[in-house]
Amino acid sequence: FSGGALVTVIVNSSFMKFFTDVIGISPALYGLVFLIFSIWNGINDPIIGYWADKQPYRTGKGKYLPLIRWAITVIGIPVIMLLFTSPGWNDVVTVIFLLIFMVIYEGGQTLLNVSFMAFTVNTFLSTKERTQVTMIGSYLNMLPAFLGGMIPIWFFTGDFSRMQLIGVFTGAILLGLFLTWIGQFSVREDETFYHALQVTSGL
């Protein structure tokens, strides 16, 4: 699921400059939106984690895999929609638009993360196995995270139009979603995993 890291880094490292320099809202307004977004991030993690944990295992579909697949769409649509914010909108409309879609995006990102974490805990029951999987995932995240961090350096420092920037960021986000979609094929759920359910509650 390293593609999710690419999208996260783009949102965290590029969106402020995009909205302040390209769209034209003030850094203070963007900071206010990000503050509300951060508060929502802290609130929604246990709520979505609890909800995901209570989902039943569906024969032929799984418990967390359907949530992971759904989360990919929930992440992608709002982030790409935000790139098409118009510089001609007034600040109030822009802030409301930004806040709504950032909240939706964060919900999808949380659903993806807690579902994969819970799947990992329930599938790899020993601490050693979970540690190995976590370490491998951390290494795999490095390249997409590096790419996401370099994109603003490459493209915000040049003479690129708004539409060119939209094209670049849309392509990078779609790449991240594609990598995440490929990654979900590695998830193999067995109903017997959940007979020995361990500590997913509250993730």
What are these regions (language model features)?
Residues 1-203:
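Membrane-embedded alpha-helical bundles of multi-pass transporters/translocases
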